[in-house]
């Protein structure tokens, strides 16, 4: 089963490395372009690019997914499934419809709670006691596709973004291996279940205004924000 991996940051790199370790047939990695960082504004590669190159896997870094060159590259790679983890851009319909088994997203929440860009931060800020990872078949909506598998973890009072991010990245790596093995064995439709639209919450991108402490809030709310 040929796999194209689409992801950018460390969260995605953890899953990518796990797929390599488990000998999945990764035929390409799609990631964001290199970006300038630091005082010298030197171009730095995304973590997924570094991992892919270390394994000898072709890297694609399109500025936009709508250009003809990338469309042709994806068609040439002919993936059976595309795995998506924190890629950073919405996927156009032709990408969603390219692979035989669809695009499988590793999302860092227990959907339908915390659909959107910042599920880890938002669950901490809301004082949630548990969260997890969901693997889902992507559709045109924002994290609205059919759920394949999920795995939970508790959130302790001592957790912060870093500790929870690291735990969820490991959990996501484990879960995507499980999901892909079942897809390989023809069990995708057995896993597939419609995602409920009840009790939905949205994890909007963290803005500067979210980082301002409102001292009129309770001590618990202030602690969770920090």
Predicted segments with their positions:
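N-terminal Rossmann-like dinucleotide-binding module
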Residues: 1-40
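N-terminal glycine-/serine-/threonine-rich beta1-alpha1-beta2 phosphate-ribose binding loop
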Residues: 36-78
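Donor/substrate-binding cores of folate-linked one-carbon enzymes
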Residues: 22, 32, 81-202
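A structural microfeature
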Residues: 28, 61, 148-149
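Internal anion-binding site segments
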Residues: 197-226
């Amino acid at each position: 089963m040929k796999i194209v991996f689409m992801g950018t940051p460390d969260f995605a790199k953890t899953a990518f490395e796990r797929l390599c370790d488990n000998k999945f047939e990764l035929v390409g990695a799609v990631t964001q372009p290199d970006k300038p960082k630091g005082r010298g504004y030197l171009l730095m590669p995304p973590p997924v690019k570094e991992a892919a190159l270390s394994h000898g896997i072709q890297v694609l870094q399109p500025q936009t997914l709508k250009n003809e060159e990338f469309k042709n590259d994806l068609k040439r790679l002919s993936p059976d499934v595309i795995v998506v983890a924190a890629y950073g851009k919405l996927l156009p319909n032709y990408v969603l419809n390219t692979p035989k088994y669809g695009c499988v997203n590793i999302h860092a929440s227990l959907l339908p709670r915390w659909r959107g860009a910042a599920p880890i931060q938002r669950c901490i800020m809301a004082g949630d006691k548990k969260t997890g990872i969901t693997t889902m078949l992507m559709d045109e909506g924002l994290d609205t596709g059919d759920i394949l598998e999920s795995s939970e973890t508790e959130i302790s009072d001592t957790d912060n973004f870093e500790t929870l991010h690291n735990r969820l990245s490991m959990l996501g790596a484990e879960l995507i291996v499980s999901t892909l093995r079942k897809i390989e064995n023809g069990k995708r439709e057995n896993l597939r279940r419609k995602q409920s639209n009840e009790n939905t919450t949205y994890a909007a991108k963290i803005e500067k205004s979210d980082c301002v402490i409102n001292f009129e809030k309770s001590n618990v709310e202030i602690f969770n924000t920090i």
